[in-house]
């Protein structure tokens, strides 16, 4: 950084804010086998072993004055990731399948940076899926049921780090799960028309989410308090997502209408839909929301493809996309970081004279974009 118009604090041009030495070792090996036992019935087995090693050293002076802890890690993770499944073609148009898989995810660099006071754990996922599929020349459809059980799932906390990135943590997520049903269908009754639709309905929960806070007792001493909130909604996990696409085409021209519905989302994992903002005198000022509301949007794309063989090119496509044609006002992201504690005998999410412990990212209103692509 060489220049800042209005620095908020003492500014040092060309200061080296950060230096870090890090090594990551990633080794994996796998065995895969598949067998068809009889016509239409097959099974498969995938076995993977993976080793991940982290070595990070940081002199702890990457902020002026050494006000932040440096990044240091000496971690090794060994993962065994099996997957087994079965597939059966009942007849020409109908098939069913089932699978079980286990996978692991190591913490990434941002996790070390945002959770430097914790000993980070790897995420473990066990996934069971069962599905059915129908397919014909003009129509195809499928249904998939899944249950995903997590240990130490990395979930977004709703908080931001010092550069505005979302913080993910598994310090208190413990056991959690995601379960639901996925549906999709495609219908093409004529060469000039196609209809695609898919939907996902899910339940996403943390089993025993915990929070902690500090209180001052009658003697003026700081006392650590905590609470187990039990089963709570997983943050940023809508329980309904529906997409619908109509496609019209004639010779080189095409038109596509895309609609999407996304259900409401929690900004934290605590199940609080709002926090209470108190004035300095202890009176209630207002409630500040900590939810992303559901929304429905529609986009339209128009395009035309034409050949360019006469000038030595394959073809070109010119198009224009109109986004959010109904000018829907909605937020597609946000953050929330209130305090927690007992207020009038009730566990409360709150702040004192601070309306900015929750924020939202509004999406663009109606807008459009033109494009041109050329294939050589």
Predicted segment positions?
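Gram-negative outer-membrane beta-barrel transporters
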Residues: 147-149, 169-274, 373-375
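Signature of Gram-negative outer-membrane beta-barrel scaffolds
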Residues: 1-91, 106, 211
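Membrane-embedded beta-barrel scaffold of Gram-negative outer-membrane proteins
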Residues: 89, 93-101, 121-179, 184-188, ...
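Extracellular loop and loop/strand-boundary signature of outer-membrane beta-barrel proteins
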Residues: 12-20, 32, 60-73, 113-119, ...
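Residue-level signature of outer-membrane beta-barrel architecture
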Residues: 25, 31-36, 78, 86-90, ...
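Short loop/turn motifs that connect adjacent beta-strands in outer-membrane beta-barrel proteins
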Residues: 38-40, 91-93, 138-140, 192-193, ...
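Conserved C-terminal beta-signal and adjacent last beta-strands/turns
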Residues: 98, 194, 231-376
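Transmembrane beta-strands of outer-membrane beta-barrel pores
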Residues: 3-5, 49-55, 100-106, 136, ...
